[in-house]
Amino acid sequence: MSSNQDVPLPFTSSRPLPSRQPTTSRPGGTLKRNKTLTRPERHVAPAPLVAPPTQSFSPTSPLPQSDGFLNIDWWRLWAYATTFWAPPVLLRWFGIKEKQSRQAWREKIALCWIAVLLGGVVGFVTMGLQRALCPADQQNQSMYQRLGDTNMTLSISGWAFNISTSITQSNVDFYSLANQMPGQDITDLFTRSVSDYPACTSSLAYSSGAFCNSTSSSSGTSCVLSSMSQETFDSLQIQNTSLLEGYSWDQVAKLENYMVIDGYVLNMSPYLSFNPTAVEGDEVDSIIRHVLSNQTGSGKDATRLFFNRQVPQDAVGCMKARYVAGRIDKITPGCFVASFFLYVSLVVILAVVLARFAMACVFNWFLSEKLVKPVTEKELGRKGINPTIMPEGANVSVNNKLGTAPWAGGGGAAEGKGGGVGPGKKLVNGKKINPLSPLPSPSHSLPNAPLITLSQIGPELFTVCLVTCYSEGPSSIRGTLESIASTNYSDRRKLIWVVCDGMITGQGEKRSTPDVCVGMLDADGRFGNPVPMGYEAVGSGQKRENRAMVYAGHYVSRNGHRTPTIIVVKCGMPQEATEKKPGNRGKRDSQLILMNFFSRVTYNDRMTPLDFDLFRKIWTLMGVTPDYFEAVLMVDADTRIYPDSLKHLVNCMHHDNMIMGVCGETRIANKRQSWVTAIQVFEYFISHHHVKAFESVFGGVTCLPGCFSMYRIKARKDGDNDWVPILVKPEIVNEYSQSEVETLHQKNLLLLGEDRFLSTIMLRTFPRRKNIFLPQARCRTVAPDTFSVLLSQRRRWINSTVHNLMELVRVRDLCGTFCFSMQFVVFMDLVGTVVLPVAICLTFALIVNSIITPPKSFEEAIPLMLLAIVLGLPAILILITTRKVVYVAWMLVYLLALPIWNFVLPVYSFWHFDDFSWGETRRVEGEIRSKGHDDSTAVFNGTTIPLRRWEDWEKSRLRKLRREEKRRKEMERQFGAGFHGDPRLGGDLRGMGMGERPWARSEYDSDNGSLYSSEEDMWGGEVGGYNEHNPAFPPPPIALPPTDDPVSNINGETLGMDEMAAILDSGFDDDPQSQSTYPPLSHPRPHAHPPPPPISRTLANAPSPVRRHQHEYNAPQPRFNRIDSPSFGSGPNSARSSPHSADAGRYAAGEYVSIDRQDTNDLDAQMPHSGGSVSSSVESRPHGVGHAKKRSGGGAGIGAGTGARGGGYGPLGPLADVNEVGRGQTRGYGGSGKDR
């Protein structure tokens, strides 16, 4: 088969093409249309947030839009329109010289204008809408007295008077009038003059007629009572009730000669008495007579007729003053609209507030408790996809039927079987064996079947704990690592992954951050000194390329935990050596090192040298390949997690497969350090237990904080038959790794709030999956203790919140519908964030106004009720959820600081929309303040970093080892065993595996089918100068228990207890001086070997990362060191060369299984036969029931070559020195040495 095996073969058959299948599903069926509406290819993927979509022929890609009117950049035009008064010359004169900075400034002004407009709208709706639609003279319904409802009352000029104590007059009987109709109008009984009505200046009839109308005379000229003054009222003993006389529309319709203008009821009887006939040419008279004669059943409202023309409109004021009898006491349309809006606002806001409160309580009480329960045996008993099976869309050869990863078959790098890829072996006829065909695996320590029971993985998922460091000090970093290592989570299932963001020394620190981190590592000596490995970073211009060194070992906690640890130190390119912060690319780049690595592992995509180096070291440290990891915990370097937090988070992932991200509660560790930390305590609490708890009910937590959040790397599908990449999905990784950002919106998304932006991307990509909050998982972090640092931190948070909510509000697939949806809640959060300054000002105005003029009605009290509910419910939530009264005191402190939270911080943030720096948050020694507008003049012309798949990197690694071995043999033939740099004498090549015992030979060592011969492979320098399979070190740990597959037992026979005891007796030597640290010969597959705990040592004598960085670029190392050069090997000369003498009991107890040595022959000459010794493995059995299995055949002996330095390691512990037990014999792996 040709090397282009992934290319589909052309159709060359002479048979005709198959005919079309029948359209009916069964005989006699009917013709039906297929379910075209459910075709997944018709789903339109969301457009990227940052980079525009590229041209693609995928049916899921959005259709390209043609250039036209709709493609105009309206936002850029709006930015220029709002800043037309600031030409570029003026901005350059004020110091804004870069084009990007000027554009960012214009966009900032445009956003501030929008914030001001929204604030104005909110202010008008809150304070001005009521006054505009319902003036003060129309809005108070309690000022009215309805006509006919109150006895012993009459009205004068629209006001109700009490006549119960009045003196009876000879010409007017007040009591008789009140009995006829309580409240009727008696204004025309009083004497009035023109001076009483200054608005009546016209000569028309309505203004110049008589003022009086006698009840006993029809002449209309006599007035029975004196003028309307307080003296007259006192003499008549009638009292003004200060209530307006109210009329209903029905009453006005029934009353003769009454009509309405603009809500005023007018008694036109005096006018008609004085003008019994129509006045010729009088437009006002015509309207009056038309309304009174033609609208007898409709309330006689003349408002529209009077306001249509100028002359009648001028008469309105005079007519209201002269003929008023009362008011319409029904609510006016304006007041109705204002009241309706007020009540709708009350219902909506109250519903949202109460719903948030209720759902937060329900989640804290019930839902979260279910998520943290231990995983049951029933859940672990179901079948699931094997972690070594790659997801759909991965790079899988056409012959790989199961889709297994190339490193998964049979055990990994040393074999390349069972789905692995390698050069293959030639047959006699010259054809190659198909390297992807499933071959029998000699190892059964890991499950090989496509579907496995989840119990084989166990309740503890393989988890990466990512710690991103920048300029933190030793105490912060050690506290974080100590808290992770001390969690009640197995050290075999967690990997601490530390990323140091550049060669940086924090302000006030004596050592650089990389030096601090590496100094805490108990390094694994097999990896030697790391070399810088290239990778593609986040940056512009030449910053797109970067290099990093990978330190591997264990972090040893105070309570004895030995946790596998990887430290990635970003050291930068050679030209950065003289810069202030070489290698620094930001926190997002640190996260993307991990995300890109696991994405390439998941899809078998092309790897950078850094990825391959990480792959090898993780495999060696953990005993499993990286594709076994399913979750990643992201923690900041100043955060300390609680001991049970990691287990709670993983249990949450177990119970709900739809959860893609989960965060815990973050508490403040320095709450009493200053007033700045004190005002943050309640804010942290309420943002988690109120906001995030409510969002968790919908599964849509909009911000998973970067200081303490767990993401799912990949999830099993509902049918457990395939993987769904989550965090490492290419769409997420590509969008999160954008380097070229131009607009202010993009920079706020990517440069300030990378954690929130990652949550936004995941919710947009997987709107049906969940981001939740888990209150049982807790951590403590150090909050800003000075106001300047708090100001800088909240500026980043507020600005990133605004821009991320602007993107989330456009996601239509979030949970819920209309007002009962997560999208509506996001919209309210966005508006609420923008109008915070206006809201706090209106709040104080409301409080002051309520104190000066207390509310007199329910409607006036509604704003105060809302304010009390919004501020009071959190206190109730505290008592319900935590039952800690002390948080009520912290709430009072928070309320006192409301002007800071809602006015000072937002206003400062909005005005600094164009500042993309971290400000005062993390200062570096010698750092110069930058706003993030660095316009790099260098152009990224492509990367020099090689990208190759794992198979190709592995071939290059093995070829390099072969070249080094060939070179060593040649040197030995020329100069003898003691030549300069001989690795057996402590030379530099010990890190390459050139110890006393060479490594195992592998079928990867063949050059068949390779593009390069072993001497022409150009990638050796990118592999790394170490051999993780160095037999001078213990094999990797057993990460998974052996499976119960019966196939694994076909090569052995059961031994009795006596025979087992004899084997154990013959496998050890009681002389402690003869014990050695060398393992058996051959490279084991890392997950197929029983490990004693790895021999490790610190890098106390090694150069620091900073010095190492300078050393690598300024002084190249010679190929061979002096004979007396120090070595990183942990042999007998090491101070801790034999720490494993007590491990035999652990082997005997069944904690480790035997090392299978099939196909691991030495590259050197054949070793002497060891006789008939037996390799045995001890299974984990109850006490007294154990048995062992006798292995047939054996690999090469390990006796030869070990006599000079001592023994090696067998499956049951340290082997005795061959000088003690006989020349050429071994204890452990037996066999003739040629059976395999």
UniProtKB/Swiss-Prot annotation:
Induction statement: Induced by the antifungal agent caspofungin.
Enzymatic reactions: [(1->4)-N-acetyl-beta-D-glucosaminyl](n) + UDP-N-acetyl-alpha-D-glucosamine = [(1->4)-N-acetyl-beta-D-glucosaminyl](n+1) + UDP + H(+)
Transmembrane segments: 77-97, 109-129, 335-355, 824-844, 861-881, 885-905
Cytoplasmic domain ranges by topology: 1-76, 130-334, 845-860, 906-1236
Keyword Thylakoid carried by entry: no
One Pfam entry name: CHS4
Bias kind Low complexity: ranges: 1170-1179
GO BP field: cell wall organization; chitin biosynthetic process
Gly residues biased stretches: 1193-1211, 1225-1236
Any one Gene Ontology cellular component term annotated for this protein: cell septum
Protein name per its UniProtKB record: Chitin synthase 1
Subcellular location(s) of the protein: Cell membrane
